[in-house]
């Protein structure tokens, strides 16, 4: 409806490329806001219609008048928008804004003199509207009033009434109103058309008021028409846009394409606008060759390059990066770029300038003025500068080639760019010579992006340099900076010239005068370089060329419409030429852009793209409601198909107008439901074979030949015919064939299983690809063939999985070795069981193909054929659920049943860490079955945290799996989602939506799109593998798992429910007692933490910092403590060996006779590492470290450190490298020793031990030997904390040492090292959370303490604390649990170690923890001990004091029963035996705390330390082989239980119910306290511990 003079719709272009891009546009990409996307200007002042009252006559802005007109046009404007942009909507404020613009125009047309006829309105339009929009608007209005069929959309009758009554106040003919309304409708349609184009370019679908302001600002024609006054220009802050540094290859390629499109438009401007207008005034077109040279050849090269770049981008949408080097290489090898050499020499020659001047001097040149306002001056001044654009763009190519070569990651791409650089080097040199020959004063055009960036920088500079600069001028007028120069201004009436500094922007020209009298500015004032003298808005300025005269040369005139003209003079002719070129470019660019758009649309109308007839090509059937239905306005981009026939789907899949990669993915995922693979390939081959243009245009050829006579007519017909064929091949054949190959590439790349199932399909595809011809197509055929070859090779060579982060899988965990047919939940390690289930289920999940889901084939008869992998995972999940259910119900014995249930929950705990939701919900389903859910007594016997965790897992499946979905969205892969949810959703979609649209035969593709969305979610979790090893025995067990072979579901359910009733009858008051089914299997769980952790030191810092200590230690074999077994109840010796300063033994956790595997630094690494850096010169290594003097394990990479889930959960590390033999290790750390094992089978000596005094060991040691009772294992064995229902006992050997340089402490598998000359220490280990190294980061001075796990103070705990005191000790006062006990003054030479250990291991319980001197239950003992030490020191001689050496070794042996008739001591749990009055360490409890114990202390800290050292030397003399130092407790933080001195080495013990120290054969050996009461139920209290605990990393 809205068309220009030729009947074609006209649009405005945005883009500010070299020369003619509009200032506000963001290029063809249509970028968003601000200076890049439309200037950020606000168009018409302030969002209102300011200025309407400036016109004489009716005031539309008065309240009473505005109320009559408000909302009159908005309903009709919606209809106008539907006509120009059917798929775009507009907000109400945008429509009101357009309405106000229309009212402003109406006020202009109805101003005095008042119009009485149509001719009066025409005159006003000619005067008010700038060219060429005045003629287009008048033609549109005349067509409306002259046509009986066409009527205006705007309400003509209402406007006619208001005009007569209110505006004009006299009667007018209805034709006048109709004419006015038609003009308004044309202008409103033009505005809405431009706004719609703009929002589509920025990927929006709704027009806002701001969008209209942007496009109004970008169009000078409309701004001229509305003639906005300066007073109503509102300031718009110009913010610096995001810097696009093009750091990536992809972004650079996109920028190249953007620049290439703008360059193509500049070439169109040269060819279509200037060249074709000049052809009209010459007799022979060859006269223009000196001016334009071979510009057509350059245009062809540009089109070819741009097409190749776009093809590469489309083909590589799902690849890592597009490789565009081949695009340049093909053109360079064909010497296509050489056209720039000829062009550069021709255009810059004097002959070219002379030819243009001669042309303009011809009489016919006067007709150029009719081409548009200022066109003749544009030809004279602007065209020569525009002709330099192709030369400058050649240098843009050189820059892009160099930049892309540097960014490319493909070796082939880099080689292509290197080849191109070599081929184009001669051209580069030639063009540099040409540019050097140009006059230095002749300015070279720059790109629009550079001009926009310069505008931002210069406006900020002018704010600082120019006095009286106003920010309000910036917003819509300073989007591009054109130039900065000096001109002379002629004074008014006098021949006085004044120098002006001129700044030219796309919408503003500022003339400034230099500040010659610079004064020292006052405080806070700014010193300006210039003063603002004049400013002109370029849309209201005309430029008039002034011929040279004797008085005035090189001058031109600026003629503002509202101000008197001024004359400016340039330095010389070339200077004037450049200024005129820039000024005319700014003024005429909007008019030239509109003219170019009209020409391009006219070309399309003259040479329409014709489609083949449906008879010869079935994919050319026109769209209709019978073959395709589109979605309702889903987006402003590519239309979405709701339903279509199969041929229409194939047509849109390979559409010639646009590419839709989302539709390609959706179609290839879901097509199998309505089309077979064979049928799809056949349709794609038919789609590729497009009819020849001779068959399409044969009717036009005969008609044209008969309708034209003469040679000229035949030549014109041939040219037109050639253009038709050319457009057909370029715009239809090539895009369709290219997109067919793209679909084939996607098919073989992402759905190759179709070809694996059907070899004939693959053979047919290869046969088709062999016969594809054409150089451009062969390149893409080769890419498809490469993918096919790669897929075939992958099938033949089972590629090894490369795990994320480069980690190795953790080693296999074993619990009990039993035959395969005796595997149960109790025999498998819960950690490894969960790992293997997760690994198996992920592989099953990964193998499910989209073809197994589309159309719900798993519910059909042939499901075994169509959905084999899906049925496999469904069957496996059901079997696991049945197996858990059967294992629980068949366990008659209550303790076994409870252990099995606990073991199943532990498996779920690990699965939650591994994100195996499918496995978790399968076990939850087993717990929720009728036969298990009713076992009330069994569930009540579970520990509290187990019950709580089970409830949390059950909540995952509540409320339609709401919490599960939230959790799934929050985790990072790898994971195993619950497949049942996907199947349910797909089934609901399949059954709830018809396959065909209602009352049609069209495929319901919206249904397929929804299914594809679900399948896409499934696929996104299939690509990240687990870093786990496969254990063949467990894998085979679960692959063959069939708990009820051959039974029906009803038979299984009945059997399980009957078993459940038998083991727990209805209403039973107590649990029935049954004998144990597996009496030989220990019921205690090994926990869910790995029980072996090798120790290695891969830090390079350790080798130098500990060389002296290691060398001294390696020179001797070391002292060990051997707790001999003198009673039948003791079967093991605790053997400790420490060869180096960096090694300390911990339990291996292996079964008897089993060798631990080679160390793996990432043994427990499953997920991404977490960094724990150095703190205060102490670095924590990833694993407990050791240095071997006999061999190197070959590990050189820095291992990923680990953190424990709970404080006190001691992880034992495999340390066979430091033991005398593997058998010794097996004995010391076996989880349970059989009762029949004779003592002789155990080693009772250490080959490294000697009778002589051993050199000091640099590290304290802790060796744990579990008791022989079956099922009672020490918590030190590296598993989850023991349940209070299981007692534990162990033999503990502590070997301590003190050095002047630093201390290292080991307890329960944790190694705490204060830095010894930079030596890195160790950190606790977690099996599932990796902690990578970052030793160069600085943190607080000391590591933070672990989170406290303080127990509630109860009466029994208080009594136990009192029992620990000496018999004559005073009664302990009650203490508040939150108060910190007063510290003992520190030993200066051990302050570093004490400070370190206090904060790094504040919760290490009985064996590792706070200094015993910091605890109230030991402080009084230490006071009395001090006096005893003083007396002994005075009575003991010191003959060997000097020979003792600076290093001493403390050995503390806590042995189990020595005599056969003595009862065993109470078991001690390190996690449950801490003092009941211990409060968490706070920063105030530093070693230098001034708090002093309330009991008197006679000696100062320094004298006290001296006495301790004296006593140490005496002990060394008394016991040269094995000696003890009690004062080492507060120096190295040994266990804080009190010790008493006894001279009688054979003192007997009392009943274990009361606490008496354990005696040894050595005087002064510390005594082991009793196990405290477990009534606090620490582990089962959810407030005290969580399911997976992690150490705190924050300061308490």
UniProtKB/Swiss-Prot annotation:
Residues 1073-1105, 1175-1212, 1235-1291, 1340-1392, 1465-1596 are annotated as: Disordered. CDD domains: HFD_SOS1_rpt1, HFD_SOS1_rpt2, PH_SOS, RasGEF, REM, RhoGEF. The modification Phosphoserine is found at residues 1550-1551. Keywords: Developmental protein, Differentiation, Guanine-nucleotide releasing factor, Neurogenesis, Phosphoprotein. Residues 248-434 form the DH domain. Residues 480-588 form the PH domain. Changing residue 1322 to S: In strain: In_L019. Residues 829-1066 form the Ras-GEF domain. GO terms for molecular function: guanyl-nucleotide exchange factor activity; protein heterodimerization activity. Changing residue 1503 to N: In strain: In_L019. Residues 637-792 form the N-terminal Ras-GEF domain. Residues 1526-1542 have a biased composition (Basic residues). One of its GO terms (cellular component) is rhabdomere microvillus membrane. GO terms for biological process: axon midline choice point recognition; defense response to virus; epidermal growth factor receptor signaling pathway; epithelial cell migration, open tracheal system; fibroblast growth factor receptor signaling pathway; imaginal disc-derived leg morphogenesis; negative regulation of G1/S transition of mitotic cell cycle; photoreceptor cell fate determination. Residues 1175-1195, 1280-1291 have a biased composition (Polar residues). Residues 1096-1105, 1469-1489 have a biased composition (Low complexity). May form a complex with sevenless and DRK. PANTHER family: GUANINE NUCLEOTIDE EXCHANGE FACTOR (PTHR23113), PROTEIN SON OF SEVENLESS (PTHR23113:SF363). Promotes the exchange of Ras-bound GDP by GTP. Functions in signaling pathways initiated by the sevenless and epidermal growth factor receptor tyrosine kinases; implies a role for the ras pathway in neuronal development. This is Protein son of sevenless. The gene is Sos.
């Amino acid at each position: 409806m809205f068309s220009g003079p030729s009947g074609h719709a006209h649009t405005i272009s945005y883009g500010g490329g070299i020369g003619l891009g509009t200032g506000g546009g963001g290029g063809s990409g249509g970028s968003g806001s601000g200076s890049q996307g439309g200037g950020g200007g606000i168009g018409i002042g302030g969002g209102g219609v300011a200025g309407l009252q400036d016109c004489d006559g009716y005031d539309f802005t008065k309240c009473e008048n505005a109320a009559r007109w408000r909302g009159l046009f908005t309903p009709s404007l919606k209809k106008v928008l539907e006509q120009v942009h059917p798929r775009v909507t507009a907000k109400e404020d945008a429509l009101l804004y357009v309405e106000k613009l229309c009212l402003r125009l109406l006020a202009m047309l109805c101003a005095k003199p008042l119009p009485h006829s149509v001719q009066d309105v025409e005159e006003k339009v000619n005067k008010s509207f700038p060219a060429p929009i005045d003629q287009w608007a008048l033609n549109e209005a005349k067509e409306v009033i002259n046509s009986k069929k066409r009527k205006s959309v705007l309400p003509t009758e209402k406007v006619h009434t208001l005009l007569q009554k209110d505006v004009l106040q006299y009667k007018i003919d209805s034709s006048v109103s109709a004419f006015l309304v038609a003009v308004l409708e044309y202008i409103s349609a033009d505005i809405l058309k431009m706004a719609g184009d703009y929002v589509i370019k920025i990927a929006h679908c709704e027009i806002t008021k701001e969008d209209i302001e942007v496009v109004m600002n970008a169009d000078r024609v409309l701004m001229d028409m509305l003639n906005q006054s300066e007073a109503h220009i509102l300031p718009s802050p110009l913010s610096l846009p995001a810097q696009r540094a093009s750091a990536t290859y992809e972004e650079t390629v996109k920028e190249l394409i953007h620049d290439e499109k703008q360059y193509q438009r500049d070439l169109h401007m040269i060819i279509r606008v200037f060249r074709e207008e000049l052809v009209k005034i010459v007799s022979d077109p060859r006269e223009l060759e000196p001016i334009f040279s071979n510009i057509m050849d350059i245009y062809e090269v540009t089109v070819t390059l741009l097409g190749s770049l776009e093809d590469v981008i489309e083909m590589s949408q799902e690849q890592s990066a597009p490789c565009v080097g081949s695009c340049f290489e093909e053109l360079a090898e064909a010497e296509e770029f050489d056209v720039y050499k000829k062009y550069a020499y021709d255009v810059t020659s004097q002959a070219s300038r002379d030819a243009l001047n001669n042309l303009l001097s011809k009489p016919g040149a006067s007709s150029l003025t009719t081409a548009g306002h200022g066109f003749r001056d544009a030809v004279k001044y602007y065209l020569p500068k525009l002709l330099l654009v192709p030369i400058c763009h050649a240098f843009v190519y050189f820059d892009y080639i160099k930049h892309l070569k540097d960014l490319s990651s493909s070796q082939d791409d880099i080689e292509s760019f290197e080849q191109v650089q070599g081929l184009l080097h001669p051209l580069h040199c030639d063009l540099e010579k040409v540019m050097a020959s140009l006059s230095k004063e002749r300015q070279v055009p720059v790109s629009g992006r550079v001009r926009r960036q310069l505008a931002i920088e210069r406006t900020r500079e002018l704010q600082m340099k120019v006095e009286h600069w106003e920010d309000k001028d910036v917003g819509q007028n300073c989007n591009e900076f054109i130039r900065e120069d000096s001109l002379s201004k002629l004074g008014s009436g006098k021949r006085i010239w004044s120098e002006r500094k001129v700044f030219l922007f796309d919408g503003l020209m500022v003339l400034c005068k230099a500040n010659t009298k610079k004064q020292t500015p006052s405080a806070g004032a700014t010193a300006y370089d210039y003063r603002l003298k004049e400013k002109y808005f370029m849309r209201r300025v005309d430029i008039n060329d002034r011929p040279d005269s004797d008085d005035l040369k090189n001058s031109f005139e600026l003629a503002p419409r509202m101000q008197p003209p001024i004359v400016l003079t340039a330095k010389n002719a070339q200077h004037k030429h450049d200024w005129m070129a820039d000024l005319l470019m700014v003024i005429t660019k909007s008019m030239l852009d509109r003219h170019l758009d009209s020409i391009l649309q006219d070309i399309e109308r003259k040479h329409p793209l014709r489609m083949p007839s449906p008879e010869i090509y079935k994919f050319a059937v026109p769209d209709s409601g019978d073959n395709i239905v589109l979605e309702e306005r889903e987006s402003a981009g590519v239309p979405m198909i709701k339903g279509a026939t199969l041929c229409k789907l194939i047509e849109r899949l390979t559409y010639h107008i646009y590419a839709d990669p989302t539709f390609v993915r959706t179609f290839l995922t879901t097509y199998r439901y309505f089309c077979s693979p064979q049928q799809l390939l056949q349709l794609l081959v038919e789609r590729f074979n497009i009819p020849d243009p001779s068959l399409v245009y044969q009717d036009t050829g005969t008609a044209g030949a008969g309708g034209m006579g003469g040679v000229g007519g035949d030549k014109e017909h041939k040219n037109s015919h050639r253009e038709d064929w050319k457009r057909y091949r370029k715009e239809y054949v090539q895009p369709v064939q290219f997109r067919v190959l793209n679909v084939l590439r996607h098919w073989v790349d992402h759905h190759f299983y179709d070809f694996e199932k059907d070899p004939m399909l693959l053979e047919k595809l290869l046969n088709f690809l062999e016969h594809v011809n054409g150089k451009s197509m062969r390149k893409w055929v080769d890419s498809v063939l490469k993918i096919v070859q790669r897929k075939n090779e992958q099938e033949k060579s089972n590629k090894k999985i490369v795990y994320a982060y480069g980690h190795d899988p953790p080693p296999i965990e074993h619990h009990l070795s039993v035959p395969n047919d005796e595997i149960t939940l109790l025999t498998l390690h819960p950690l490894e069981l969960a790992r293997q289930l997760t690994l198996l289920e992920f592989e099953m999940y990964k193998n499910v193909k989209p073809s197994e889901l589309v159309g719900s084939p798993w519910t059909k008869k042939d499901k075994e054929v169509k959905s084999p992998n899906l049925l496999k995972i469904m069957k496996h999940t059901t079997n696991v659920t049945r197996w858990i259910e059967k294992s629980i119900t068949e366990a008659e014995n209550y303790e076994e049943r409870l252990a099995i249930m606990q073991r199943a929950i532990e498996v779920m705990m690990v699965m939650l860490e591994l994100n195996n939701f499918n496995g978790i919900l399968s076990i939850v389903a087993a717990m929720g079955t009728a036969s298990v859910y009713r076992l009330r007594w069994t569930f009540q016997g579970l520990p509290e945290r187990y019950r709580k965790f089970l409830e949390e897992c059950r909540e995952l499946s509540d409320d339609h799996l709401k919490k599960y979905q939230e959790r799934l969205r929050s985790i990072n892969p790898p994971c195993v989602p619950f497949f049942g949810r996907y199947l349910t959703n797909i089934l609901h979609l399949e059954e709830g939506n018809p396959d065909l649209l209602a009352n049609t035969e069209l495929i319901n593709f919206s249904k397929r799109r929804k299914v594809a969305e679900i399948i896409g979610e499934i696929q996104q979790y299939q690509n990240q593998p687990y870093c786990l090893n496969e254990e063949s025995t467990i894998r085979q067990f679960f692959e063959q798992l069939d708990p009820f072979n051959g039974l029906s579901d009803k038979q299984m359910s009945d059997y399980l429910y009957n078993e459940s009733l038998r083991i727990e009858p209805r209403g039973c008051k107590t649990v029935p007692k049954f004998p144990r089914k597996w009496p030989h299997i220990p019921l205690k769980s090994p926990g869910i933490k790995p029980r072996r952790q090798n120790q290695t030191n891969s830090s390079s810092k350790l080798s130098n910092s500990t060389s002296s200590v290691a060398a001294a230690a390696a020179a001797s074999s070391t002292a060990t403590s051997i707790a001999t077994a003198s009673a039948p109840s003791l079967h093991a010796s605790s053997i400790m060996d420490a060869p180096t300063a960096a090694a300390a033994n911990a339990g291996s956790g292996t079964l008897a006779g089993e060798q631990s595997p080679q160390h793996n630094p990432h043994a427990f690494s499953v997920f991404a590492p977490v960094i724990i850096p150095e703190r205060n010169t102490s670095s924590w290594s990833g694993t407990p470290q050791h240095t071997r003097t006999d061999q190197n394990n070959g590990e050189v990479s820095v291992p990923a450190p680990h953190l424990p889930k709970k404080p006190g959960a001691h992880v034992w590390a495999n340390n066979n490298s430091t033991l005398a033999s593997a058998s010794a290790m097996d004995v010391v750390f076996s989880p349970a020793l059989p009762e029949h094992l004779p003592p002789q089978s155990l080693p009772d000596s250490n080959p490294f031990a000697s009778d002589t005094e051993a050199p000091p060991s640099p590290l304290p040691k802790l060796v744990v030997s579990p008791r022989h009772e079956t099922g009672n294992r020490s918590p030190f064995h590296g598993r989850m904390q023991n349940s209070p229902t299981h007692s534990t006992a162990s033999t503990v050997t502590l070997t301590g040492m003190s050095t002047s340089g630093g201390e290292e402490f080991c307890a329960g598998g944790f190694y705490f090292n204060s830095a010894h000359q930079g030596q890195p220490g160790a950190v606790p280990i977690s099996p599932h959370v990796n902690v990578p190294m970052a030793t160069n980061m600085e943190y607080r001075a000391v590591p933070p303490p672990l989170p406290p796990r303080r127990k509630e103070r109860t009466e029994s705990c208080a009594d136990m604390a009192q029992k620990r005191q000496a018999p004559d000790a005073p009664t302990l006062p009650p203490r508040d649990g939150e108060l910190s006990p007063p510290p003992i003054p520190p030993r200066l030479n051990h302050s570093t170690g004490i400070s370190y250990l206090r904060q790094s291991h504040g919760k290490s319980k009985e064996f590792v923890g706070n200094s015993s001197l910091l605890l109230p239950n030991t402080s009084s003992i230490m006071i009395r001990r001090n006096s005893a030490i003083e007396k002994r020191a005075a009575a003991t001689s010191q003959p060997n004091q000097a020979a003792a050496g600076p290093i001493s070794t403390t050995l503390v042996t806590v042995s189990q029963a020595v005599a056969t008739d003595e009862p065993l001591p109470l078991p001690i749990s390190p996690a449950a035996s801490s003092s009941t009055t211990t409060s968490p360490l706070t920063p105030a409890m530093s070693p230098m705390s001034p708090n002093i114990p309330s009991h008197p202390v006679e000696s100062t800290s320094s004298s006290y330390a001296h006495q301790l050292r004296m006593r140490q030397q005496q002990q060394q003399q008394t016991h040269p082989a094995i000696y003890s130092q009690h004062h080492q407790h507060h120096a190295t933080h040994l266990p804080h239980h009190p010790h008493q001195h006894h001279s009688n080495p054979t003192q007997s013990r009392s009943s274990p119910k009361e606490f008496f120290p354990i005696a040894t054969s050595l005087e002064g050996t510390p005594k082991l306290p009793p196990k405290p009461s477990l009534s606090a139920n620490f582990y089962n209290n959810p407030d005290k511990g969580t399911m997976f605990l992690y150490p705190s990393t924050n300061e308490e």
